[in-house]
Swiss-Prot record:
The keyword Iron does not apply. The record marks 68 as: Reversibly protonated during proton transport. It comes from Azobacteroides pseudotrichonymphae genomovar. CFP2. The lineage of its organism: Bacteria, Pseudomonadati, Bacteroidota, Bacteroidia, Bacteroidales. Pfam families: ATP-synt_C. Belongs to the ATPase C chain family. This is ATP synthase subunit c. Keywords: ATP synthesis, Cell inner membrane, Cell membrane, CF(0), Hydrogen ion transport, Ion transport, Lipid-binding, Membrane, Transmembrane, Transmembrane helix, Transport. NCBIfam families: ATP_synt_c.
């Protein structure tokens, strides 16, 4: 077990997998922060102007979907880097 782990690190696949995991993790964290900021701004806008809640909600969902799509693409690319 330990020998196989050491051989993986020695050949470089261990470091590649570490980079893959770090890249995917950073992409997901960034997407989470971005979607949180979108939600925060939407709630502030709805609180200021309740009559525009439908339009604000629709724009919020579209923006969150775009951010989530970019995050999913980044995770897939990180998965195929090896």
């Amino acid at each position: 077990m330990l020998l196989s782990i050491l051989l993986q690190v020695a050949t470089g696949t261990g470091l590649a997998k570490l980079g893959e995991a770090l890249g995917a993790g950073l992409a997901v964290i960034g997407a989470g922060l971005g979607i949180g900021k979108i939600g925060e701004s939407a709630m502030e806008g709805i609180a200021r102007q309740p009559e525009a809640a439908g339009d604000i909600r629709m724009n919020m969902i579209i923006a969150a979907a775009l951010v989530e799509g970019v995050s999913l693409f980044a995770v897939v690319v990180c998965g195929f880097l090896l």
